[in-house]
């Protein structure tokens, strides 16, 4: 680039920044001619409005519908159940937690696919002497699953822990086996080898997966199922109670929890925090730059209501803050109302509930445990944390 051209570029860039700083328009294009439709978003939203769902909930024949819909969801997401449990390729620990020395933390690196290892961290109390109920923890789109056991790795982690993000540690204190699964794209599973990465941590994975007929949500659900395969195998060092395998997920972890529970009936209770809303409402109100929801053809077959209906009759709680800017509480209510006929078909209408929390998009430990005790695990009765 010659000097005069470079100067023109710098000048126009500086003027553009100045206009932006002063709150002035920066769109260089003229007003769109009257009567024209130039928005790709409006085009796609219009085509979605009247699209019939080929696998919409059919409560009149719920068993047949769940069988067919679960198979179709697996195909759409690229979810494939493993035929054998994963193997341990490395172990880190055990080490006592500084804030809870009677709880040991051990990370197992599980070979879940030929070129994919999954960090699964177990938290176990020293008094564990019988098959343990499982609290499987999926963090949100934050720094990683280490929040589950109360560790900080980046500055903002202190704020997250101050409002109760260490839900797996809290569960372990209450008698569960805490199982912290690192999600694809975050923490130790963040992409570090792709030569030229995009700014968002998961968009490359989502697009590459879509090109292979897979999806980020499918990969996450497969990792959850592989973790359960291992927990139920003889390789797991702690016996578990297969009738009390539960999942807690927040934000992107909550979305993954919903899909995992819809696809894997071994999950016997799910609490999805800050993550329940109809996908059509999400794409109608905001961009999806991380590719988390990229499941090609989803709206031809499903809506979020149907995903929740696949969880029936197993307990489900959708919890959200009344001021959540992504997953507002009224959106939780609509999705759960849409799934309620499935629960009624099983005479289990009391097993699904929308729970409102007082603020915005964040963890809610107290409200989560109240709903957990009431809906997810009636056998949970320990009100006081213990080490």
Name the predicted role of every residue range.
Residues 1-103, 386-387:
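N-terminal targeting or regulatory segments adjacent to alpha/beta-hydrolase or S9 domains
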Residues 226, 267-308, 313, 325-335, ...:
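Mobile cap/lid helix-loop segments that gate and shape the active-site cleft of serine hydrolases
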Residues 4, 337-387:
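C-terminal catalytic histidine-bearing segment of alpha/beta-hydrolase fold enzymes
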Residues 311, 318-320:
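Short beta-strand/loop motif that positions the catalytic acidic residue
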């Amino acid at each position: 680039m010659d000097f005069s051209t470079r100067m023109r570029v710098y000048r126009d860039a500086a003027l553009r920044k100045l206009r932006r700083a002063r709150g002035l328009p920066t769109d260089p294009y003229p007003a769109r001619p009257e009567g024209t439709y130039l928005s790709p978003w409006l085009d796609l939203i219009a085509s979605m409005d009247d699209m019939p769902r080929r696998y919409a909930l059919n409560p009149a024949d719920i068993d047949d519908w769940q069988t067919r819909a679960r198979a179709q969801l697996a195909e759409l997401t690229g979810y494939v159940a493993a035929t054998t449990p994963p193997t341990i390729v490395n172990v880190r620990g055990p080490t006592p937690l500084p804030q809870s020395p009677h709880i040991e933390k051990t990370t197992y690196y599980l070979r879940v696919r030929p070129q994919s290892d999954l960090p699964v961290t177990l938290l176990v109390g020293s008094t564990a002497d019988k098959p343990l109920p499982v609290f499987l923890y999926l963090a949100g789109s934050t720094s990683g699953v280490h929040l589950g056991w109360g560790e900080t790795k980046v500055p903002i982690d202190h704020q997250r822990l101050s409002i109760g993000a260490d839900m797996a540690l809290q569960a372990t204190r209450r008698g569960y086996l805490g199982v912290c699964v690192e999600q694809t794209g975050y923490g130790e599973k963040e992409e570090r080898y792709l030569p030229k990465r995009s700014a968002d941590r998961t968009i490359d994975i989502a697009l590459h997966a879509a090109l292979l007929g897979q999806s980020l949500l499918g990969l996450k659900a497969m990792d959850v199922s592989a973790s359960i395969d291992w927990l139920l195998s003889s390789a797991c060092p702690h016996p578990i109670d297969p009738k009390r395998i539960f999942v807690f997920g927040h934000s992107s972890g909550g979305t993954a929890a919903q899909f995992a529970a819809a696809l894997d009936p071994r999950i016997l209770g799910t609490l999805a925090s800050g993550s329940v809303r109809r996908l059509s409402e999400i794409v109608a109100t905001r961009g999806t730059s991380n590719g988390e929801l990229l499941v090609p053809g989803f709206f031809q077959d499903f809506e979020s209501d149907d995903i929740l209906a696949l969880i029936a009759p197993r307990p489900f709680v959708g919890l959200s803050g009344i001021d959540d800017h992504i997953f507002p509480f009224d959106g939780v209510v609509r999705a759960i109302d849409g799934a309620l006929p499935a629960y009624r078909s099983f005479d289990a209408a009391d097993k699904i509930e929308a729970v409102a929390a007082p603020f915005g998009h964040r963890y809610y430990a107290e409200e989560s445990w109240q709903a957990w005790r009431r809906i997810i695990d009636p056998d949970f009765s320990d009100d006081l944390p213990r080490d």
